[in-house]
Amino acid sequence: RQMCIRDSTSPVSPPPFMAGAAEIEVDLETGKITPINYVAAVDCGTVINTNLARIQAEGGLVQGLGMTLYEDMQYTKAGKMKNRNFMSYKIPTRLDMGNIKVEFESSYEETGPFGAKSIGEIVINTPAPAIADAVYNATGLRFRTLPITAEQVLMGLLDKEEA
């Protein structure tokens, strides 16, 4: 059986929209992916406080980039988490992110306060597909699981070489 969702939007709380594009470098000797630029366009209705909205968007993008490239929860057979500290559970630092640029598309949402829509969760969704597509453009390899690690990229490149 599959879990299906019929409708995930509310007529009284329209969703925000976002598009993202990633520019990366892939080291073909090691498989390491380095983010260079990430550009996001966000429609969250009327932006009430641009500085706070930008910080919210940038923070969510960093979380999404971390989920895409670094964060890998590992468990023992008994269900205990193996990587329980920041030495073994990797999260990105500001130095890992490259340049992030966020632009807002202003629209007016009648049901929102002062025409605003939410911005909280939408920004974490675009880094994974944007980076996966950038890796595909750079290597011809398609990844559908996260994180996309240097080891996976290198193994894919070696397999591709042998074929």
Q: Which residues make up each language-model segment?
A:
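C-terminal catalytic domains of large/alpha subunits in multi-subunit enzymes
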Residues: 2, 6-163
